[in-house]
Design a protein with these regions (language model features):
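Conserved small/polar residues in nucleotide/adenosyl-binding loops
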Residues: 1-5, 307-316
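Conserved lysine of the Walker
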Residues: 78
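Walker A (P-loop) phosphate-binding loop of P-loop NTPases
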Residues: 75
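Core recognition of P-loop NTPase motor domains used across DNA-transaction enzymes
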Residues: 4-64, 120, 134-136, 140-152, ...
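C-terminal regions of RecA-like/P-loop NTPase motor modules
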Residues: 127, 133, 159-176, 193-195, ...
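The Walker A (P-loop) glycine that initiates the GxxxxGKT/S ATP-binding motif of P-loop NTPases
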Residues: 72
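Cytosolic-facing regulatory segments adjacent to core modules
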Residues: 57, 88-175, 189, 293-297, ...
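Hydrophobic positions on the alpha1 helix immediately C-terminal to the Walker A/P-loop
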Residues: 81
């Protein structure tokens, strides 16, 4: 192990040791306060709302210290989904969101947010061919994003140790309330781990959970699925489809899949209902709550962002 990576490991270990053992009484007091705070909220959402009502009803919002894995095959809308939630948390609820984009540049990522916020298609924004009215719409609606507490880091090939150091600084300086990583398999665990990808991914997922606990914020990490999902008739993902490491499932407090049947030519369900424009969020693991499925509306023309299917005013 190189000196830099060894020092990072020692620093992490030292940080964990410094946390004192506590007696149960003050912990109970803290737990009771949390229960009382949840009881006082009329919507029953104890965590940070995603903005999707049906999803929040199942999850009760994103909880501090939770590691949430959002997985899907390519082009299913993983980035669109988390960007939709990031926009809602930052613009609507004024919570600081940190996004680490290892796949797209910061400008590409923000262009997606602009498309969603302005309701101007990605194609129009790409070509710049806007009418005078659309230019006015762009400048008028973009103000909400300009003022939003969204932080973007597009450092490529980021190591888990660099991520942890950056997140500590962001928590101290901006008070970030949620961390988003796009996506897990593009991270590294240092030079010593290269060549053993399964062990590397295991270390990364374990450290992401540690970051969530250390900073007391939800950490949402996108993940790829293997091709096994495409061998099934219904094409629905399962926990066994998580790519490269079973430790991802083990470390996660929640595992969610994004499933778009129409991508596989499945346009109606067993009851004859249309599946066009539908994205199903499958909650396959939920350590502290229920599992199940939630249907959301998919808007491909707005850079594949997800909208709720059951409430017109829930635009994210």
């Amino acid at each position: 192990m190189c000196i830099r990576d060894r020092k990072a490991v020692f620093d992490i270990a030292d940080g964990n040791i410094k946390k004192d053992t506590a007696e149960i009484a003050p912990i109970i007091d803290e737990a009771i306060k949390g229960i009382q705070a949840a009881a006082e909220k009329p919507d029953g959402i104890s965590g940070l709302p995603s903005g999707f009502n049906a999803l929040d009803a199942v999850t009760s919002g994103w909880q501090p210290s939770d590691l949430v894995i959002i997985a899907a095959r390519p082009a299913m809308g993983k980035t669109a989904f988390v960007l939709s939630m990031a926009r809602n948390m930052a613009v609507k609820h004024h919570q600081a969101v940190a996004i680490f984009s290892l796949e797209m540049s910061a400008v590409q990522l923000v262009n997606r947010l602009i498309a969603s916020e302005t309701e101007l298609s990605a194609e129009k924004l790409k070509t710049g061919r806007l009418t005078d009215e659309e230019w006015q719409q762009l400048h008028s609606r973009i103000k909400a994003l300009v003022e939003a507490p969204i932080l973007v880091d597009d450092t490529p090939a980021l190591s888990i140790f660099e991520l942890r150091a950056k997140c500590r600084r962001l928590k101290q300086k901006y008070g970030i309330k949620v961390l988003i990583i796009d996506y897990l398999q593009l991270m590294t665990a240092g030079a010593d781990m290269r060549g053993n990808r399964e062990q590397e991914v295991s270390l990364i997922s374990r450290q992401l959970k540690i970051i969530a606990k250390e900073l007391s914020i939800p950490v949402m990490a996108l993940s790829q699925l293997n091709r096994g999902v495409e061998s099934r008739p219904d094409k629905k993902p399962m926990l066994s489809d998580l790519r490269e490491s079973g430790s991802i499932e083990q470390d996660a407090d929640m595992v969610m899949f994004i499933h778009r049947p129409e991508k596989y030519g499945i346009t109606v369900d067993n009851e004859g209902n249309s599946l066009l424009g539908i994205a199903t969020i499958i909650i396959a693991k939920h350590r502290s709550g229920a599992v199940g499925e939630v249907n959301l509306r998919f808007r491909a023309e707005l850079t594949c962002l997800l909208y709720t299917s059951d409430a017109a005013d829930d635009r994210i």
